[in-house]
């Protein structure tokens, strides 16, 4: 597709300096997925779209979209920033990671189908106060397919049964029912609750989610499973993920200090 001026919906992912007065702004769009935009004079005092291109801003834009090169923004309307995400270190970290995952999973300039609405819904829910780790875990679970990993969550990969206890096997690429656990002594040894939530995460439409509460122990196990899959099967080493791990260590250390006091 040649460059064409059109209206589109976008989410500002990040931006970086370019020359003295200009910016490169990475945006997730509903038309061509992730795309890099050149914004001339964006650092100049009095620039009219300053608020429209702040990180974690979303809204309607008009510009020239290019599938194979830099795109351009002409104007913006009905934009607003996710203020709680922008100001809260934990929400900020998880949303930064979500956007980095999406940026890694999909090529620039290509439509990502329903993923735009799913990511937008994730950010809306985090902004509203739903657990940012759990919302991120849903995105992580569903994005595995985009990275070429397609775990079978809903049934035993050997016999197809789903009425028995299930556990995940990296070797077999999915769940094993208890009749076949002996096939993989290195399976993940999931408890029923963790297995259940992973099955739900794989298919849930975040646009229809209103609330979700999961106890801390199960949250830790869910994260351990997804970290294992991303480390071993996907092989990503994102800066945003490293920051989240470091942030969680800070929280654990603060908790220990509070207990000692």
UniProtKB/Swiss-Prot annotation:
Source organism, top-level taxon: Bacteria
GO annotation, cellular component aspect: bacterial nucleoid
Xref: InterPro entries: ARFGAP/RecO, DNA_rep/recomb_RecO_N, NA-bd_OB-fold, RecO, RecO_C
RNA-binding in keyword set: no
Keyword Glycoprotein in annotation: no
UniProtKB keywords: DNA damage, DNA recombination, DNA repair
GO biological process: DNA recombination; double-strand break repair
Family per similarity comment: Belongs to the RecO family.
Role according to the record: Involved in DNA repair and RecF pathway recombination.
Name of this chain's protein: DNA repair protein RecO
Organism: Limosilactobacillus reuteri (strain DSM 20016) (Lactobacillus reuteri)
């Amino acid at each position: 597709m040649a460059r064409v001026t059109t209206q589109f919906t976008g989410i500002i992912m990040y931006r970086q300096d370019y020359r003295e007065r200009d910016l490169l702004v990475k945006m997730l769009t509903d038309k061509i997925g992730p795309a890099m935009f050149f914004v001339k004079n964006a650092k100049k005092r009095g620039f009219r779209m300053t608020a429209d291109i702040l990180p974690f801003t979303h809204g309607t834009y008009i510009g020239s979209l290019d599938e194979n090169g830099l795109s351009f923004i002409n104007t913006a309307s009905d934009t607003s920033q996710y203020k709680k995400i922008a100001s809260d270190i934990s929400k900020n970290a998880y949303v930064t990671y979500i956007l980095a995952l999406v940026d890694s999973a999909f090529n620039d300039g290509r439509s990502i189908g329903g993923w735009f609405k799913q990511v937008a819904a994730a950010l809306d829910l985090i902004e509203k106060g739903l657990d940012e780790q759990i919302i991120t875990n849903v995105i992580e679970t569903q994005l595995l397919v985009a990275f070429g990993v397609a775990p079978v969550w809903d049934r035993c990969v050997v016999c197809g049964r789903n009425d028995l206890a299930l556990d995940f096997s990296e070797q077999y690429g999915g769940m094993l029912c208890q009749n076949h656990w002996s096939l993989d002594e290195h399976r993940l040894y999931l408890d029923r609750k963790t297995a259940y939530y992973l099955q739900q995460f794989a298919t849930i439409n975040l646009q229809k989610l209103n609330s979700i509460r999961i106890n801390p122990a199960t949250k830790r196990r869910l994260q351990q499973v997804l970290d294992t899959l991303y480390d071993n099967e996907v092989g990503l080493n994102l800066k945003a993920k490293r920051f989240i791990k470091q942030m969680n260590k800070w929280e654990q250390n603060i908790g220990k200090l509070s207990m000692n006091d």
